[in-house]
Amino acid sequence: MDGWLRLRPMRPLLLIPLLLTTAHAAFEELAPGLFLSRGTCNTYLLREGDAALLIDPGDATALADLEQIGVKKIEQVLLTAHHREVLQGIEKLDRRVTQVAAPKDEQAFLETPSDFRKWRPKNGDKFSVNGSSYLRPPGQPVKVDRWLADGDIIEWHGRQIRCVSTPGHSPGGMSYVLGDQIFLGGVMHDGAKMTNWFDTEWDYGFGKGLDALIASVDKLAALAPKTAFSSHGPVIADASAQLAAFKTKLADFRPDYIRGYPVNNLSKRGPHPATRPTAAQYIVQVSPHLYMFGPEMAGKNFAIIIADNGHALLLDCGLFPRLVLEQIIRDMKKHLGLKQIDACWISHSHGDHFTLADVLQEQGVKFWTLDSIVDKCENPRAYDYPAMITSYGVNFERTKIDRVLKAGDVIEWEGYKLHIDWMPGQTEFGNALWLELDGKKVVFTGDNLFGDPADPEQNGHECVNARNSAIIEEGYLIAAKYLQKLQPDIIMGAHGVLMTEPKAFIDRYHDWALRIIAQYKALLPDEDYEYGYDPYWVSAYPYRVDLSTQDTQTVQITVRNFRSREQKHRIVLQTPPGIISEPEVLEGTVAAESRQTFPVTLKLEIREKQPAGVQIVPFDITLDSRHYGQLFDFILMAKE
């Protein structure tokens, strides 16, 4: 076998793509000595005599057809990223013959993949969006023979392959340059598009992953390649032009992706002119019966309606200390006529809106929220969503909901009619509460929009984050249309954001939603772009399956169809050794534009043989005739 660093004389590169590819069973011959096999990803094969080098083995389907193209041995494999679908068949390689190389910056993801699936996630977990991991590591560790860094040269049969670090589609992604050709993994899809969105979403709407991708695209464009070979989709024949166009697309998209208000000023603003101070510490008055935090507590969650008889309703309560809550309750009783807080309404599923639930429940306060939010509060670790209550610290486990609301409910409370409506946006799991209060129509909207309606440059949208289960058409666009129809006088956002005279602001919010939908459609390759946006179109409930105290658990697998026609699926659960899935394979159909849930029973065979800690269970997904591979997963624990 050729060593990794053995120097050989350079040979002329013969990698100009043929006008017509030549078929060799599972392979297409793109150029003399260069072949492509399409499986869960594009697998590229360089041939020299009867030896070959592979870039991304995918599901390794092509291995069965090597002899038909004259290959007897795979000497080397190069990985572009840690994503399962580009390497899930790697165990089929003969590791006595084949050496594997991968990006050094992805070493931990490949060697210790379960480290990046947390049984008890925290907002600060590395490589996560507020506790929801954006990595998609293999179910089992991968043995790698050489770790590659930016600028390394791989010598193989006279070819010099240069390693170029290109994060963005993956935190440590690597491209491989051979003359004027680039194997760029998932950095770009043909058509100057993203391979998907969810692999580039690295933070809570601040653009870290997007900025890394833009920088990598710029880096590759500077190399002026003629042809690029992507991990998915067609060969990119006009690579330099497409990279330039892609950079422009991403740069144009970025301003609409980043929040529609100056988020860094959220906790630095001064008093709102529509409020006036009160004798209660930190509390300002919006109207005779409506109060909120003033600028000293900007960014915290607290608003309260105090009725004439002293009974009160809280609208979210979190992100500040217990002692502060106890002090302001005393102050409100002394100065604002507060006698009793009856209930606290929760606007959406994120835990920072009810971190003080335990304190309030000790005082008899009841908690209300919409039916679709309840289980996220009561069983937060059953979900792989960001910012669940447990991610805010070890003292937070769950919050019991006392009153389950339904969209359309009207609650009579102290002479007011409280209207409850489903209001998605930042997350699918949100609701709005509105009422006529002190001569104004006031709506409480949670985290769906923020900003200053008087500033024509602001459109108010909060972060775009697919991991919030937040497809734009099913979220922000619905929120905008809802507000346009409601025509409120006052919008009470969470985190102490008061928005008055919001009509034009709402219209800008609506226009932004339409605009960013169009941008995602232009950036993502699938006709139904949601397959490249949503990381939950196959998902498990519970996401964390506890087999540590019982041998059997039922898991509900939900399959989503975004298409306007029936969709066939085949989903294989890649359970670890000693765990049986019944059934092991889910095969069926899902009606157009719908979702369906299928029960699966997991059984533990011999507990003593199970490893301690988290184990990953990938879904190997086929929709209709396309094998997507091991895109998504859930986790289990058989032994603590």
Q: Where are each of the predicted segments found?
A:
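Short solvent-exposed strand-capping/beta-turn motif centered on an Asx-Ser/Thr pair
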Residues: S548, R560-E566
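Active-site HxH/HxHxD metal-binding segment of metal-dependent hydrolases
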Residues: G3, L63-I153, L323-V324, R330-V410
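Intrinsically disordered, low-complexity Pro/Gly/Ser/Thr-rich segments with frequent PxxP/GP/PP motifs
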Residues: I579-Q610
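Metallo-beta-lactamase
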Residues: A52, P138-K143, I153, Q160-A241, ...
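Short acidic, flexible loop segments centered on an aromatic residue
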Residues: S564-G578
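Terminal connector regions
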Residues: R607-E640
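Conserved beta-strand hairpin/beta-sheet module of binuclear metal-dependent hydrolase folds
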Residues: F27-I69, S175-D190, I283-K334, A432-G451
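Low-complexity, acidic Ser/Thr/Pro/Gly-rich terminal tails and inter-domain linkers that flank the onset
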Residues: I517-S548
